[in-house]
């Protein structure tokens, strides 16, 4: 039978054969294996019904994958041997390949993943630990695209260009790997979920990969998976206004705006999408978002992200303009010291200037924090490590090409 999700299901009761035709069938089944990692509970329920099993198996599998971080079906003790045999032939549980992992002395962790077939493309994820009033907080910054099409002038990811959207398995796989890194040496029965917060602030614009991102966040919120609070899952956007309204209709998560400028001329320069959706439209969309459905818990305020660029957007008048812009929008402001990257056209604002900027906002009644710089020793700024890895890869390929050319010259001369 062929399911709606394109799964070829073999008859496990049929007698096995060593014929060439049977081998061909097995190869076709392997090609059609579906990855369960990125499937929602509803999709898993449909999957199990399509292979002739009960829907409750979906919850069992989700817990094994996302709460105990088990990918080997043989370790799933409440799944029968017969069902495991069937599943092994039609599905897999596969996270993105980790090509680099770096753990900073300050607790920050960073992974570079290869996604796609063959040599694939590179994306990265950063985990930032912190202490708060609830105890130890671990915030994971997740990527949604390979590269980014928005080309914000201060962002290293945008300089790499846009390649493609990530799939749900590639998005949720980042969360899976981060959690699994804390429990890989822990007995299965004692494993817990380490990541407490997720921010969709990594490589790419999440709202331009809308369906896979919303799908992945729904898995984060599912009690059979990560069971995260709506207030602890945040989507950050540079300002794709129509999709902010669509997000409000589909999912209740916290919203962050990558603002970075308090007026349209400057934001046009720093965040080019502002030319299409200027500040007036963006702020109005943010106001609609937090008032949707009676101001639910995840939507009491919007987080405003503001990177501090020396001599560009950090003057006293910029702080005053920001106060005026946000006066009717319940918001928390996060000032971000700029992380320079190779050939960056900007520098980081001085500590004194950042503190003065913060004081103006705080005096106006805003909650305003300064993001602590972490992971400097592992290039934890978004896009930096992927850029370095890609650069090393290009240099290695160029060197191999030169060696091959020299060898060809030597052979021709000999």
Curated annotation (Swiss-Prot):
GO terms for cellular component: cytoplasm. The keyword Iron-sulfur applies. It catalyses: adenosine(2503) in 23S rRNA + 2 reduced [2Fe-2S]-[ferredoxin] + 2 S-adenosyl-L-methionine = 2-methyladenosine(2503) in 23S rRNA + 5'-deoxyadenosine + L-methionine + 2 oxidized [2Fe-2S]-[ferredoxin] + S-adenosyl-L-homocysteine; adenosine(37) in tRNA + 2 reduced [2Fe-2S]-[ferredoxin] + 2 S-adenosyl-L-methionine = 2-methyladenosine(37) in tRNA + 5'-deoxyadenosine + L-methionine + 2 oxidized [2Fe-2S]-[ferredoxin] + S-adenosyl-L-homocysteine. S-adenosyl-L-methionine binds at residues 204-205, 236, 258-260, 339. Its EC number is 2.1.1.192. HAMAP family: RNA_methyltr_RlmN (MF_01849). Belongs to the radical SAM superfamily. RlmN family. This is Dual-specificity RNA methyltransferase RlmN. It comes from Acinetobacter baylyi (strain ATCC 33305 / BD413 / ADP1). The lineage of its organism: Bacteria, Pseudomonadati, Pseudomonadota, Gammaproteobacteria, Moraxellales. The gene is rlmN.
């Amino acid at each position: 039978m062929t399911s709606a999700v394109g799964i070829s299901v073999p008859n496990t009761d049929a007698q096995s054969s060593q014929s060439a035709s049977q081998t061909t069938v097995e190869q076709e089944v392997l090609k059609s294996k579906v990855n369960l990692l990125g499937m929602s509970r509803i999709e898993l329920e449909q999957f199990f019904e399509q292979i002739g099993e009960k829907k409750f198996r979906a919850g069992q599998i989700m817990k094994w994958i996302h709460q105990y971080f088990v990918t080997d079906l043989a370790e799933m003790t409440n799944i029968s041997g017969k069902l495991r045999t069937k599943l092994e032939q039609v599905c897999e549980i596969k996270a993105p390949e980790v090509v680099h992992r770096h753990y900073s002395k300050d607790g920050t962790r960073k992974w570079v993943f290869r996604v796609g077939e063959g040599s694939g493309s590179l994306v990265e994820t950063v985990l930032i630990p912190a202490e708060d009033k609830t105890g130890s907080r671990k915030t994971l910054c997740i990527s949604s695209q390979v590269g980014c099409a928005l080309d914000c002038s201060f962002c290293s990811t945008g300089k790499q260009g846009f390649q493609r959207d990530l799939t749900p398995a590639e998005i949720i796989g980042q969360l899976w790997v981060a959690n699994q890194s804390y429990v890989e040496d822990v007995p299965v029965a004692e494993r817990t979920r380490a990541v407490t917060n997720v921010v969709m602030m990594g490589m790419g614009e999440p709202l331009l990969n809308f369906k896979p991102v919303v799908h992945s966040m729904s898995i984060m919120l599912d009690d059979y998976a990560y069971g995260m609070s709506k207030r602890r899952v945040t989507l950050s956007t540079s300002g794709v206004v129509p999709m902010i309204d669509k997000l409000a209709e589909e999912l209740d998560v916290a919203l962050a705006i990558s603002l970075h400028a308090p007026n349209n001329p400057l934001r046009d320069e720093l965040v080019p999408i502002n030319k299409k959706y200027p500040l007036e439209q963006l702020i109005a969309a943010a106001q609609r978002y937090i008032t949707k459905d009676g101001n639910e818990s995840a939507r009491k305020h919007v987080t405003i992200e503001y990177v501090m660029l020396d001599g560009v957007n950090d003057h006293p008048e910029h702080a005053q303009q920001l106060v005026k812009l946000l006066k009717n929008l319940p918001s928390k402001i996060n000032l971000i010291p700029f992380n320079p990257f190779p050939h960056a056209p900007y520098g980081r604002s001085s500590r004194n200037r950042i503190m003065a900027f913060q004081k103006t906002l705080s005096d106006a009644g805003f909650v305003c924090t300064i993001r602590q710089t972490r992971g400097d020793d592992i290039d934890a700024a978004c896009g930096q490590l992927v850029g370095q890895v890609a650069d090393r890869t290009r240099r290695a390929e160029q060197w191999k090409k030169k060696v091959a050319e020299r060898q060809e010259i030597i052979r021709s001369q000999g």
